[in-house]
Amino acid sequence: MKPQLSPKAIREIREGTCNPLGAPQVTTDLSENIILTSLDDLHNWARLSSLWPLLYGTACCFIEFAALIGSRFDFDRFGLVPRSSPRQADLLIVAGTVTMKMAPALVRLYEQMPEPKYVIAMGACTITGGMFSADSTTAVRGVDKLIPVDLYLPGCPPRPEAIFDAVIKLRKKVGNESILERTKTEQTHRYITSDHEMNLVFSENTGEYLNKTSANVIPPSKKEKITELPENTEKTEIINSVED
């Protein structure tokens, strides 16, 4: 009678004949090399270190943000790459006073940015109008009246360290978002600002004054008579100037 082989011996014989290198073995280290996550977390993780800001500086607050570009603070380590086109940016940093004439341009830039997009209101003049909110008729009292703001950064002006803190808090918000929240740009919480007390004034440039011919025509009695020079006067003056 042939001796019976154990299952372990049979497995070793098969491994030696079928696969000389041996069968793959699952080790305990494999569980440490697999990350289980959702599509939201993967998408948010990829965007955390790739926020491309569009710099919209209108006043002195932007000088503090310009200090971040230097080697002392080095904002490149956060993945911030300034863009000059709103179609390539996903973060709008508004730094400085926003006037009534610049408001349409700001809204147009925000609308040209692709989704998802975020806004940081930097400085007191951007958030509430600052010192211009009391009696100025040209300053916007809060940029959140024009576009939705995700993060308020108060200060006059804020320090570069405060800007870093704002970017870190914005990254936390981005990391906790879901797919359904990316399309919602409505702002739920707004900064307390004073409303504009202005009256609607129609434009005076209607063109009606051009149709009033009586206002443009000078009466004949008030017209001054033009004194005509003799014909030989100009010729004699030219001849005398040439001879001299």
Curated annotation (Swiss-Prot):
Reactions catalysed, as given in the entry: a plastoquinone + NADH + (n+1) H(+)(in) = a plastoquinol + NAD(+) + n H(+)(out); a plastoquinone + NADPH + (n+1) H(+)(in) = a plastoquinol + NADP(+) + n H(+)(out)
Domain of life: Bacteria
InterPro entries on file: NADH_UbQ_OxRdtase-like_20kDa, NADH_UQ_OxRdtase_20Kd_su
GO CC annotations, alphabetized: plasma membrane-derived thylakoid membrane; respiratory chain complex I
Gene3D superfamilies: 3.40.50.12280
Protein's cellular compartments: Cellular thylakoid membrane
Positions that bind [4Fe-4S] cluster: 60-61, 125, 156
Cofactor note: Binds 1 [4Fe-4S] cluster.
GO MF terms held by the record: 4 iron, 4 sulfur cluster binding; iron ion binding; NADH dehydrogenase (ubiquinone) activity; quinone binding
One Pfam family in the UniProt entry: Oxidored_q6
Membrane topology listed for this record: Peripheral membrane protein
Keywords: 4Fe-4S, Iron, Iron-sulfur, Membrane, Metal-binding, NAD, NADP, Plastoquinone, Quinone, Thylakoid, Translocase, Transport
The protein's required cofactors: [4Fe-4S] cluster
Biological process annotations from GO: aerobic respiration; electron transport coupled proton transport; photosynthesis, light reaction
Enzyme class: translocase
Keyword Cytoplasm: no
EC annotation from Swiss-Prot or TrEMBL: 7.1.1.-
Assembly with partners or alone: NDH-1 can be composed of about 15 different subunits; different subcomplexes with different compositions have been identified which probably have different functions.
UniProt similarity note: Belongs to the complex I 20 kDa subunit family.
Function: NDH-1 shuttles electrons from an unknown electron donor, via FMN and iron-sulfur (Fe-S) centers, to quinones in the respiratory and/or the photosynthetic chain. The immediate electron acceptor for the enzyme in this species is believed to be plastoquinone. Couples the redox reaction to proton translocation, and thus conserves the redox energy in a proton gradient. Cyanobacterial NDH-1 also plays a role in inorganic carbon-concentration.
Protein name (Swiss-Prot/TrEMBL): NAD(P)H-quinone oxidoreductase subunit K
Source species of the chain: Prochlorococcus marinus (strain AS9601)
Primary gene name: ndhK
